[in-house]
């Protein structure tokens, strides 16, 4: 998957999903689908994530969002939409044996706790779809908490860029070790 051209779908626009969608958008990547508990939005050409985040921050839900070229989809529709990368960042058991055969993503990054059932995981594996497990995908917060602890006990101060570089190094090393399994 070429990150620069990857179509990304994010289920859940809370702290994890919303932030992930915003980071992808700011990095110039195409976020084609997002959702909240009321349903989702899909646009093959990419969504305006800052506008959607502003809309949500004003107390609105995605079922009320309107923009030319944007289609409303169900949460299951988001899970099975045309995309390269799928990030379930909402609830557990969103990818099941009922929808795993219809998933079009080549890579799934589990940002929610337990979003994929065991049966679905077997189906995805048999189809060659890579799943980055939640225990790895969620580890970034724990790693940064460790960095905060180290800074406090050693009276250090690291800027955000330094923290992000250290986090990226640790997470990439962990991912590569898991992927090699």
Regions from the PLM with identified roles:
Residues 1-80:
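Glycine-rich phosphate/diphosphate-binding loop of Rossmann-like nucleotide-binding domains
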Residues 16-20, 94-95, 116-118, 139-141:
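Short glycine/serine/threonine-rich phosphate/pyrophosphate-binding segments
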Residues 101-181:
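Adenosine-phosphate binding glycine-rich loop
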Residues 73-83, 91-108:
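Rossmann-fold NAD(P) dinucleotide-binding segment
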């Amino acid at each position: 998957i070429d990150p620069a051209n990857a179509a990304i779908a994010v289920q859940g626009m809370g702290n994890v999903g919303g932030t992930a969608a915003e980071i992808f958008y700011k990095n110039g990547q195409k976020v084609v689908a997002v959702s909240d508990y009321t349903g989702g939005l899909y646009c093959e050409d990419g969504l305006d994530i800052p506008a959607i985040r502003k809309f949500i921050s004003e107390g609105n839900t995605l079922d009320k969002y309107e923009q030319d070229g944007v289609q409303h989809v169900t949460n299951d529709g988001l899970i099975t939409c045309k995309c390269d990368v799928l990030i379930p960042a909402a609830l557990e058991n969103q990818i099941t044996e009922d929808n795993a055969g219809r998933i079009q993503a080549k890579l799934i990054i589990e940002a929610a706790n337990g979003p994929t059932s065991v049966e679905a995981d077997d189906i995805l594996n048999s189809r060659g779809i890579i799943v980055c497990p939640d225990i790895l995908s969620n580890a970034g917060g724990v790693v940064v908490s460790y960095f905060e602890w180290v800074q406090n006990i050693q009276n250090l101060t690291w800027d955000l860029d330094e923290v992000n570089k250290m986090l990226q190094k640790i997470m990439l090393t962990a991912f590569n070790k898991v992927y090699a399994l």
